[in-house]
Amino acid sequence: ATKRDFETKNRKKFCGRIATGDYDAVIIGHSQFEKIPMSIERQRAILEQQLEELTDGIMDLKRNRGENFSIKQLEKSKKSVKQKLEKLNDQSRKDDVVTFEELGVDRLFIDESHYYKNLYLYTKMRNVGGIAQTEAQKSSDLFMKCRYLDELTGGRGTVFATGTPISNSMVELYTIQRYLQYNTLVKNNLQHFDSWASTFGETVTAVELTPEGTGY
């Protein structure tokens, strides 16, 4: 696929060719891949699930008299998810393109998969290095597509390729598992980062040099 294929005037035609053609593989760039959306119904279902998880987390903190800071962080995340849902419900896409589900894709091979490490993360932890408070839209988009392919293939629909699966933090290992082994995490009640971290990790206090090497 070329950039021209994904210009607004050509995108629907190109996606239609994928959906109706008999191809062994279709190779496209990361930025173009993001332009093929999941259906609004599936996006809504996943956002509603995230909202439910956040609500449960907030209630759990209040029940156990958790720190106000942690509660506020989760409430901030909840507000952000609500805004996404409202935007989705009000959405009437002018660029009416074929959705990802309609393409007939049954496998994803993601090269340079480390570019998708900024996936949303909800946690009650504070002052722990490597826990990002931001998310990239392309990561959320890929996560939805991985979940969809898991349903089609029984958890064998996505392959990652990268030379740096973990570059800065063990949180990245958890993120990879969410992409590739989400159902396994759910089966073992490890889909929430705090449960995963308490099972496989240990929080320690230590002096650490900054990436620039100019301080601690």
Where are these regions (language model features)?
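Conserved helicase motor
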Residues: 1-12, 29-35, 136
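Conserved P-loop NTPase motor "coupling/switch" region that bridges the ATPase
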Residues: 3-4, 48-71, 107, 124-216
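Conserved nucleotide-binding/hydrolysis micro-motifs of P-loop NTPases
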Residues: 5-7, 31-34, 114-116, 164-168
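Conserved motor-coupling elements within RecA-like helicase/translocase cores
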Residues: 8-26
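Short aromatic-enriched loop/helix-cap "lid" or pocket-rim segments at secondary-structure transitions
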Residues: 11-14, 38-41, 120-123, 172
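Short basic/glycine-enriched coil/helix segment immediately N-terminal to the Walker B
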Residues: 15-21, 47, 94-106, 148-155
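Conserved helicase/translocase P-loop NTPase motor core
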Residues: 25-34, 71-106, 119, 127-130, ...
